């Protein structure tokens, strides 16, 4: 809620009007090892364009220390939201406050993109996995996007950079307009509303609704990744 958002801004000493990026490099060790380097390169480019840039990075306890080590040299060192020592409810509220404080997010593709849509945080998705894994996935999964927001909405409004296309300059260029009242930001807000409507505000549990929506989208769009 508003109280949690105000408390987070105060605890992180974020000045009014300061641009805030939410960085979500993943929750598994392999993901953060692959992503923190290129995420840091994106942050360096954004810091040149957006004076006073702040970065918030929610993480999970299992990778909190590796994340801290891998991000300490970023041009704008992130404020890491470490859940260790907090109750699950408090940690979750703090994470959602981070979503609300941010102007835009850089996220590894996954279920977190649906959470960002629910929070109304515009995003760019970027992901790297082992090349062999990527090759196998491309052979088996015939969809044109790995982003759940795009998949459920039936669009490509969330910019997505996978594997060799995950190049920091391109990602920074896609993120930059999301920090202002741009057409790109407005388009994401419209898509987020469609996604939330598709998932439904009532009825089955959220995870089941999300799974059904994704499966329906996969069935509609049997295209090559």
Feature map (PLM): residue ranges:
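Nucleotide-activated sugar donor-binding and catalytic core shared by glycosyltransferases
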Residues: 1-225
